[in-house]
A protein has these predicted regions:
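Short, well-ordered surface patches within globular domains
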Residues: 1-85, 128, 134-139
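A well-ordered secondary-structure block
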Residues: 77-169
Length: 170
């Protein structure tokens, strides 16, 4: 979509934080989001960066800065977006905030769901569980800042259990 804005590029810091939270979940035996069994240190696999998922996440961060929802600006489902090679994601996390633009803030906001997940409070937990789930092996993120939105900063993470071999120049 055409709009004025800026993308954050702190990829390594965001990926490191996601992997830190994954390690914490595995080393502390938190419930596996897939089957409810306790995670173990052997379940820990570092999340890898996917350029294809980053491609999707950058578009979705800009789109969702306007929609404030898991839907595209044309009203279609967020999972209908595909890379030029036809790949899509298996899960999407979004976050909005009104302070400085960076990728790690979104990761920290999703991490804040941990207590609701561990204590089964009924609160939102899907963003946190997407980060720690062993079935998600690849991630791409985009963080977009624009003064034309309700919140200045929007972060999007796209997750998948499989990678694609596409490369992109951002």
């Amino acid at each position: 979509i055409g709009m004025e804005g800026t993308y954050a590029n702190d990829i390594q810091a965001a990926l490191k934080l996601v992997n830190q939270y994954r390690w914490e979940a595995c080393s502390n035996g938190y419930p596996n989001p897939v089957n409810g069994k306790k995670l173990t240190k052997n379940d820990y696999v570092p999340m890898e960066w996917s350029a294809g998922l980053e491609y999707l996440a950058r578009i979705r961060a800009a789109e969702s800065s306007q929609t404030i929802a898991h839907e595209r600006t044309n009203g279609s489902n967020c999972f209908q977006i595909q890379t030029p090679g036809g790949y899509s994601s298996g899960g999407e996390c979004l976050a909005w905030w009104s302070w400085d633009l960076d990728m790690t803030t979104g990761v920290e906001l999703w991490y804040n769901e941990k207590d609701a997940y561990l204590n089964q409070t009924g609160g939102v937990t899907g963003h946190y569980t997407s980060m720690i789930s062993p079935s998600n092996r690849y991630v791409g993120m985009g963080a977009f800042g624009t003064s034309t939105a309700q919140y200045y900063s929007t972060s999007c993470a796209e997750f998948s259990g499989t990678n694609n071999s596409e490369t992109f120049q951002f």
